[in-house]
A protein has these predicted regions:
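Juxtamembrane intracellular "pre-TM" segments in multi-pass secondary transporters
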Residues: 1-20, 200-230
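Helix-loop boundary and gating motifs at the non-cytosolic
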Residues: 6-65, 225-265
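Hydrophobic core of transmembrane alpha-helices in multi-pass small-molecule transporters
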Residues: 28, 96, 107-123, 234, ...
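Central cavity-lining transmembrane alpha-helices of secondary-active solute carriers
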Residues: 57-74, 266-278
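Helix-to-loop junctions at the C-terminal end of transmembrane segments
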Residues: 69-81, 166, 275-287, 371
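Structural signature of the two symmetry-related core transmembrane helices
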Residues: 84-99, 290-305, 384
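Intracellular juxtamembrane helix-capping segments at the cytosolic ends
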Residues: 122-135, 327-340
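C-terminal membrane-cytosol helix-exit motif in multi-pass small-molecule transporters
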Residues: 185-205, 390-398
Length: 404
């Protein structure tokens, strides 16, 4: 059976557009680089002197900058090319790792977090555009989950490698974590070179049409349930912008060491490696809305386990179930790509970026306030509440729109 699935996966890849395949190669490198350090960013900035509230403010400021810069990315990608925008995003992430590496204060470390948020947001806008322009509607979830399966493999290994390196360099302090950011910078530079040399534009850029505001107006006129989907996007992505509290909570409250935090992240990505492709096939076959509704409770269970965990093993299980959020996010992203005509994907992704950006500004401030005033565990209860609201909104969207 494994051989059959692998063979079908290779056959699927062979018939895809070159841009889709090169983007997978790029993701393999960039995700390893991100996986070395992402789970340690909040801990690193904390080691430089920031507390939970400061972490929230730093993330919120990064969200403001990210929102202002990434809203026009989709529109610019339509006009000047997806390739140029992806190169820009990778360049910003490279600068973020350099800022982390040079940081001697939490403010400079916060600059690194802000730049990372901006660069990551660029990729979140542009990467789905590659899938949107190269994959057929009836196999889009399968293709996106296949990409996620293949490119999640480095993230299985990277956190454990990071834990070993941190231990070797002196432990979970600023000096022990700093070398990882230099390694990540080198990896991101390689990913940038791959895109620069080999990634073609999946669709030729066109400078026809009006301004970015006119593009947004066209999306609302010609799209399907656009306003409701934007509200859904805002609610459903709150966990993305409070995720930095998970490793911080594991270390500060549960006393997790570098290896436990690394294994939590590896377990998170194991969900993608082993379940992404089956989830994609089942979503395309039996319904995307049903699949999101099935996956979300597992993510909520992960948050409960994180709070009540009596030992390291339960923390790692929580990390595994936390990965179900990503499985659901990819499935719902495929729904979003089909709500507007293909020629409007740039403007549509820009609007989605705006909605996520607003959340990235507000959510960290709310999270910091909740942590300081009510208690750390209430941050995760708040996240569970957002997912309940998300499912309520999703249920109001007809199955004819979500393909089941």
């Amino acid at each position: 059976m494994l051989r059959s699935v692998t063979s079908k996966g290779f056959d699927f890849l062979r018939r895809q557009h070159r841009a889709f395949k090169v983007n997978i190669y790029r993701n393999l490198i960039s995700k390893f680089s991100i996986g070395l350090t992402q789970q340690y960013q909040s801990i690193y900035v904390s080691a430089l002197g920031a507390g939970a509230v400061e972490l929230g403010y730093v993330s919120s400021v990064g969200g403001v900058a990210s929102t202002l810069l990434t809203v026009p990315v989709g529109w610019l990608a339509d006009r000047y090319g997806i390739r140029k925008m992806l190169i820009t995003g990778l360049g910003v992430m490279l600068m973020s790792f350099l800022a982390f590496g040079l940081a001697q204060s939490w403010q400079v470390g916060g600059l690194g977090m802000g730049l990372f948020t901006m660069g990551f947001s660029f990729a979140m806008v542009v990467c789905p555009m590659i899938c949107g322009h190269t994959l057929r509607n009836e196999e889009r979830v399968t293709g996106m989950q296949l990409c996620d399966t293949v490119t999640a493999l480095p993230r299985l290994v990277a956190p454990v490698v990071a834990a070993y390196l941190i231990t070797s360099f002196g432990g979970m302090n600023a000096g022990g974590m700093r070398p990882l950011f230099w390694i990540s910078a080198a990896g991101m530079l390689v990913a940038l070179v791959i895109v620069y040399l080999w990634l073609p534009n999946p669709i030729e850029p066109s400078r026809k049409g009006g301004s970015i505001i006119q593009g947004f107006g066209s999306v609302f006129r010609e799209g399907t349930m656009v306003a409701r989907w934007l509200v859904y996007t805002m609610i459903s992505t709150v966990p993305m912008y409070l995720a930095f509290y998970i490793p911080y909570y594991a270390k500060e409250i549960k006393g997790a060491d570098p290896y436990v935090i690394g294994l939590m992240d590896s377990a998170y990505w194991a969900s993608s490696v082993f379940l992404a492709l089956p989830v994609g096939v089942l979503a395309d076959r039996y319904g995307r809305k049903r699949m999101v509704a099935l996956l979300t409770p597992f993510y909520c269970l992960a948050l409960v386990l994180l709070v009540v965990s009596p030992n390291d093993a339960v923390l790692i299980v929580a990390g595994l179930l936390n990965g179900f959020f990503m499985l659901g996010a990819i499935t719902q992203a495929a729904i979003g790509l089909e709500l507007v005509p293909r020629e409007m994907l740039g403007s549509w992704n820009g609007l989605n970026s705006l909605s996520r950006g607003l959340v990235s500004i507000a959510a960290p401030v709310i999270g910091g306030f909740v942590w300081a005033s009510l208690g750390p565990e209430y941050v995760f209860y708040f996240l569970i509440a957002t997912q309940v609201v998300k499912l309520g909104i999703l249920w109001t969207i007809p199955s004819s729109v979500t393909r089941g």
